[in-house]
């Protein structure tokens, strides 16, 4: 869902798309940054005995909040571009999903480094650059601050581009 939003936002900013169609804006999710989760997986593999862990940020945010943050980051009003389409409602959707990573914090000494607002900025910046636009630049600064030089911004943009829709069609 988040990537659908940030790709569409970039396409809207580039005048390649007019509308983003979404379903339930009130669904809450615990969105996190994949490299943080890979770090947690590495720590799991260092354990002497196998165990189960829940990995997440421990924060839940709605799709509506994501729209507010993503479009607001570019000083845009999402209400002008987002349309609700009932076909995107999921009949069996769980409305609220939030991880409890307390065991991972305690046993693995693991903490996520990237949280909601920063994740959104990383994604928006990367998708703007993928479509050929200049980004505000906060994403690269956030990655450098929290992950240092091992995680390069250009790698972030390239890895996101591997999954991008370059067809020019609207993201619905």
List the model feature ranges, each with a label.
Residues 1-172:
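C-terminal substrate-binding subdomain of Rossmann-fold SDR/epimerase-dehydratase oxidoreductases
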């Amino acid at each position: 869902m988040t990537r659908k939003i940030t790709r569409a936002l970039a396409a809207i900013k580039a005048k390649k798309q007019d509308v983003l169609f979404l379903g339930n804006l009130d669904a809450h999710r615990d969105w996190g940054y994949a490299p943080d989760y890979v770090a947690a997986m590495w720590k799991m593999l260092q354990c002497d005995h196998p165990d189960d862990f829940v990995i997440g940020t421990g924060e839940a945010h709605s799709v509506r909040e994501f729209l507010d943050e993503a479009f607001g980051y570019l000083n845009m009003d999402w209400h002008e571009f987002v349309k609700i389409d009932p076909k995107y409602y999921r009949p069996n959707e769980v409305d609220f999903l939030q991880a409890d990573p307390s065991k991972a914090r305690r046993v693995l000494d693991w903490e996520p480094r990237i949280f909601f607002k920063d994740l959104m900025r990383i994604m928006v910046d990367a998708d703007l650059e993928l479509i050929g636009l200049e980004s505000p630049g906060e994403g690269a600064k956030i990655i450098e601050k929290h992950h240092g030089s091992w995680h390069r911004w250009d790698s972030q943009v390239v890895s996101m581009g591997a999954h991008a829709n370059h067809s020019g069609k609207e993201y619905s």
